[in-house]
């Protein structure tokens, strides 16, 4: 929407849905899901990129006019992530990087110390850094302070489909952030995405929720509408939660029976 821009770095986007490509049953289904989602930005793991192969994910994105967001998936140290980001910039000609530095293979949770180190180095190197982080308001603020263009807290572990387990932390991150906050990881269905947007997230990044759905193309379309609906609800402002009922109609004009006289 023209009156509600979504900007990452210096780049404006119409869609607030960032798609991933991992886990798709086929390139054909991935392509149709990307179209249905309306995404303009799609992340690709650099370790899976082969720019010279016809019929690759990159060729699909190029044909659809979707901007590539390389990521550093699979990196365990700041050094590995920085090297991967620099290779991505050389290969793809973009300063955008989705920064991932994970602590272990079992949880795939971010390593906050290595992440912050890598983020600071890449910002100094001229990258537009979008870090995958824990739902920690303090770490989110530190990532913003070193110059990250957004913060991307997880709702729950990657691929878990558990949704946002700590909405309160998301609200704290959103309230104090001066950069876009993007849900990254954990969404399982459209209601998770709508909730993220209602909490004030500027966008949503997802992959498994679509690529592993029974009908990926339908789910992609559902996610597209969920992002829009959640954003509109956030901008509109929900009514306060109450412990008791509050009638929507005024009391004026109600029928009153005389207690001294029977109704019939």
From Swiss-Prot:
Annotated compartments: Cytoplasm
Catalytic residues in the record: 98
Catalysis: reaction(s): [ThiS sulfur-carrier protein]-C-terminal-Gly-aminoethanethioate + 2-iminoacetate + 1-deoxy-D-xylulose 5-phosphate = [ThiS sulfur-carrier protein]-C-terminal Gly-Gly + 2-[(2R,5Z)-2-carboxy-4-methylthiazol-5(2H)-ylidene]ethyl phosphate + 2 H2O + H(+)
GO biological process: thiamine diphosphate biosynthetic process
Biased composition (Basic and acidic residues): 253-264
Binding site for 1-deoxy-D-xylulose 5-phosphate: 159, 185-186, 207-208
InterPro entries, alphabetized: Aldolase_TIM, Thiazole_synthase_ThiG, ThiG
Pathway assigned in UniProt: Cofactor biosynthesis; thiamine diphosphate biosynthesis
Keyword Transferase attached: yes
Annotated region (Disordered), positions in chain: 243-264
EC numbers, comma separated: 2.8.1.10
Record's keyword terms, sorted: Cytoplasm, Schiff base, Thiamine biosynthesis, Transferase
GO terms of molecular function: thiazole synthase activity
GO CC aspect terms: cytoplasm
Primary location group: cytoplasm
Function: Catalyzes the rearrangement of 1-deoxy-D-xylulose 5-phosphate (DXP) to produce the thiazole phosphate moiety of thiamine. Sulfur is provided by the thiocarboxylate moiety of the carrier protein ThiS. In vitro, sulfur can be provided by H(2)S.
HAMAP family, per database record: ThiG
Subunit and partners: Homotetramer. Forms heterodimers with either ThiH or ThiS.
Similarity comment text for this entry: Belongs to the ThiG family.
Protein name (database record): Thiazole synthase
Species for this entry: Streptomyces avermitilis (strain ATCC 31267 / DSM 46492 / JCM 5070 / NBRC 14893 / NCIMB 12804 / NRRL 8165 / MA-4680)
Gene, per the UniProt record: thiG
């Amino acid at each position: 929407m023209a009156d509600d821009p979504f900007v990452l770095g210096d780049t404006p986007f119409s869609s607030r849905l960032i798609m991933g490509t991992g886990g798709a049953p086929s390139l054909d289904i991935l392509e149709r899901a990307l179209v249905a989602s309306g995404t303009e930005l799609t992340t690709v793991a650099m370790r899976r990129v082969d720019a010279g192969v016809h019929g690759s994910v990159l060729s699909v994105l190029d044909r659809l006019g979707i901007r590539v967001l390389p990521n550093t998936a699979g990196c365990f140290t700041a050094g590995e992530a920085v090297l991967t980001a620099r290779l991505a910039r050389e290969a793809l000609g973009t300063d955008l990087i989705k920064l991932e530095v994970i602590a272990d293979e079992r949880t795939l949770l971010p390593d906050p110390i290595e992440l912050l180190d890598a983020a600071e180095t890449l910002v100094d190197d001229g990258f537009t850094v979008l870090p995958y982080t824990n739902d920690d308001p303090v770490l989110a603020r530190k990532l913003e302070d070193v110059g990250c263009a957004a913060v991307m807290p997880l709702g729950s572990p990657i691929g878990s489909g558990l949704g946002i387990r700590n909405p309160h932390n998301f609200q704290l991150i959103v309230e104090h952030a001066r950069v876009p906050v993007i849900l990254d990881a954990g969404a399982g269905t459209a209601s998770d995405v709508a909730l993220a947007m209602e909490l004030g997230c500027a966008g949503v990044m997802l992959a498994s929720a679509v690529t592993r759905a029974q009908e990926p193309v339908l789910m992609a379309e559902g996610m597209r509408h969920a992002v829009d609906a959640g954003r509109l609800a956030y901008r509109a402002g929900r009514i306060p939660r109450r412990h008791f009922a509050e009638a929507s109609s005024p009391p004026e004009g109600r029928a009153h029976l005389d207690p001294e006289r029977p109704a019939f």
